[in-house]
Amino acid sequence: MRVEAIVEVRMTEDRGKVLKALENVFTPMRIEERQSDMGTILVATCEGHKCLEKLRSAIWRQGIQDAARSVISRGIVGEDTVVFSVNKQAAYVGVVSFVTEAGESPLGPITFTVKTNDVRQFIDWLAPRTYRGRVYYEAPPPD
């Protein structure tokens, strides 16, 4: 599994705070900086499921597996890719709030692109189905 997280650091934002927001939900192996008209773009990448453990833990801690599953499932692109976004400001305080519409996150979201051999297993691992608030199938970590 390969994961890429992209987040914009606007000119009015503190780079350290944006980096903290990213690292509250993601553990990157590498971070590259690219310049844009609006500021700097941070492109964080990693291989394997461990880099998404913080995101998964927050989803489980907040009890939002079903909502997360619904949003993430709508982001399936082709057979091996999932794209979804979380609110940068919420991530800064350790909370996961999914962004479902453009403009919903005024300072821009953190956008994840996950490439995996088994999209369904990835979703079952990150945000499994629940019944009456209890997970009834916990999938093993994806490739």
Curated annotation (Swiss-Prot):
Coiled coil: none annotated. Pfam families: RNA_binding (PF01877). This is UPF0201 protein PAE1632. Belongs to the UPF0201 family. InterPro entries: PAB1135-like (IPR002739), Ribosomal_uL5_dom_sf (IPR022803). It comes from the Archaea. PANTHER family: UPF0201 PROTEIN TK1335. It comes from Pyrobaculum aerophilum (strain ATCC 51768 / DSM 7523 / JCM 9630 / CIP 104966 / NBRC 100827 / IM2). SUPFAM superfamilies: RL5-like (SSF55282).
